[in-house]
Amino acid sequence: MIKNKNFYINGKWVSPSKPNDFEVIDPSTGEPFAIISLGSTEDTDKAISAAKNAFETWRETSKEKRLSLLEKFDQIYNRRWDEMVKAQSTEMGAPLDYASETHTKMGADISKNIIKILKDFNFEHQFDLKSNNRI
């Protein structure tokens, strides 16, 4: 039985502010396979605050650094493919081949597309202020 009751907030694993255990059921067997904690309003507020604070530095992060982080994420995702398939199969009750070919592949495809789009995306555009082609 997996027991994962902590939340990842502001760069560290933290206990929930109030205990609120929840059994996660494998739909294919009807048996519980994990116990997680459902967050409270206080936990949600902490996570939102941390995300807002993180955005202050993230918005200044260079395109190159963002690409590097996304490519690292993509490598780790693919290296842990079998774990992702197993987790998705267990959580949704899907056959392993379906979880691999559909759900896990979708995550990999989205990751690759985000990287591709970011490589070609220009965050800034210099307008010719002397031309008549203004908005």
Where are these regions (language model features)?
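N-terminal Rossmann-like NAD(P)+-binding subdomain of aldehyde/semialdehyde dehydrogenases
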Residues: 1-132
